[in-house]
Curated annotation (Swiss-Prot):
Gene name per UniProt: nifX
Keyword Nuclease on entry: no
Top-rank taxon, per record: Bacteria
Example of a GO biological process term: nitrogen fixation
KW Lipid biosynthesis (keyword) present: no
InterPro entries: Di-Nase_FeMo-co_biosynth, DiNase_FeMo-co_biosyn_sf, NifX-like, NifX/NifY_domain
Gene3D superfamilies, per database record: Dinitrogenase iron-molybdenum cofactor biosynthesis domain
Listed name of the protein: Protein NifX
The species this protein was found in: Klebsiella pneumoniae
Family as reported in the entry's similarity comment: Belongs to the NifX/NifY family.
Length: 156
């Protein structure tokens, strides 16, 4: 099995609870099929910041060699999501087995745009959670606002 050409670890990645990877040839766009990508770019994402954690460059290999896919999957072990242009169904399932969700996106989708969407979703989710936590009486009010119109005895 030929080794990975290069791997650059930028920061200690254990402090990042969310790591996402991008199949990219130019560091800026998602533009590659997962099985053929020459590079995976991995970012750590938090609600308030994003940091490049790792870049993994692969040897260009044609075909569907098992080792080629295994190296790419291994490079994603600590990631939660992979963004790519395309991925085979069998490899998609293999990624799910190691806890990585693959997302297909249109060619030339910007990595910055996807990172911003992830942060926005994270922020919105946090805001909704905070609103629920601030209103402990919400269920009581909901029950008072709505009447029960169902038959209390379903056997009738």
């Amino acid at each position: 099995m030929p080794p990975i050409n290069r791997q650059f670890d930028m920061v200690h990645s254990d402090e990042w609870s969310m790591k996402v990877a991008f199949a990219s040839s130019d560091y800026r766009h998602v533009d590659q099929h997962f099985g053929a990508t020459p590079r995976l770019v991995v970012y750590g994402v938090k609600a308030d910041r994003v940091t490049l954690i790792r870049v993994v460059d692969f040897s260009v290999e044609n075909g569907h060699q098992t080792e080629k896919i295994a190296r790419r999957i291994h490079a994603l072990e600590d990631c939660v999501t992979l963004f790519c242009v395309a991925i085979g169904d069998a490899v998609f399932r293999q990624l799910l087995q190691v806890g990585v969700r693959a997302e297909r996106v249109p060619a030339d989708t910007t990595i910055v745009g996807l990172l911003q969407e992830i942060q926005l979703y994270w922020y919105d989710k946090g805001q909704r959670k905070n609103q629920r936590q601030r209103d402990p009486e919400r269920f009581t009010r909901l029950l008072q606002e709505q009447e029960w119109h169902g038959d209390p005895d379903p056997r009738r």
